[in-house]
Amino acid sequence: MITVTPLQLLGQDDRGSNFSWLTDRTGEFLLCYRHAGSSSGQHYHTGASANKNPEVMYLLNGQATLHWCTLNDITIHTVIATAPARIEVPANIWHQLIAVTDCTFIELNTVEDVRNDSIRIWKEDLEKTLMAR
C-alpha cells in the first residue's frame, strides 16, 4: 500500500508557511518537475537498492494521482496526494504517478538507484495480466 502523509505545518503568516519532515537518508537526491497530465513510474522496485526500499518522495507543490497494485493483487488502487506531502512506496508495489496539476517532488534516491532497482511494467500490460487472473 502506498502511504501519503501530509507534512506538519509549523507556522504560517503573511510571508507564507513552514513545514517540517524527518529523514535518515543523506546524499544525492532527485528534484523532479512534472507537467499536468504527465505520467511517471509504471514500475516496481524489488528492494535491491536501500533507497528504493521503500521509495520515499516529497511532493512539494501540486497534486498527483498515484495508481498502485501489489504484485499478487487483482485490483489497481488509487490514492491522491496534495502537496506538501510525504509519499512512501514499499518494495514490490507497482506504481504510477499522474500529475493532476504541474507538480514538483523530491525523490530520496539517485538515478543509479532507479536503474538498479526498477522493473518496468506498462499499465496496459499490467491490466491485461490482472484480467487474466
Tell me what each language-model feature is.
Residues F19-L22, G41-N51, W68, H77-V79, ...:
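Short histidine-centered beta-strand/loop micro-motifs
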Residues N18, L66-H67, I87-V89, H95-V100, ...:
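Short beta-strand His + acidic residue motifs that chelate non-heme Fe in jelly-roll/DSBH
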Residues T70-A91:
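Short acidic-glycine-tyrosine-enriched beta hairpin
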